[in-house]
Amino acid sequence: ECENTECPRACPGEYEFDEDGCNTCVCKGCDDAQCRCSSDANGCESFCTCNTRCSAADECNPRCTCK
């Protein structure tokens, strides 16, 4: 039986199916290649974009959670 999985905010519709046929989120977090953060003035994430590899250090602030 599947849990009702909700993907992180800013990643709507980014689902994939696991081996049980349950949907899971593709976008995992800032240390994942599938999630890019943009940081605000306080160094916290303002939004994240799924399925994009990070290209700059400041786009992957380690304090970001992207969740």
From Swiss-Prot:
One of its GO terms (molecular function) is serine-type endopeptidase inhibitor activity. One of its GO terms (cellular component) is extracellular region. The record marks R36, C37 as: Reactive bond. Potent thrombin-specific inhibitor. Belongs to the protease inhibitor I15 (antistasin) family. The keyword Disulfide bond applies. The lineage of its organism: Eukaryota, Metazoa, Spiralia, Lophotrochozoa, Annelida. Homodimer. It is found in: Secreted. Keywords: Disulfide bond, Protease inhibitor, Secreted, Serine protease inhibitor. This is Theromin. Residues 2-27 form the Antistasin-like domain. Eight disulfide bonds are present. InterPro entries: Antistasin-like. Its main location: secreted. Transmembrane segments: none annotated. It comes from the Eukaryota. The keyword S-adenosyl-L-methionine does not apply.
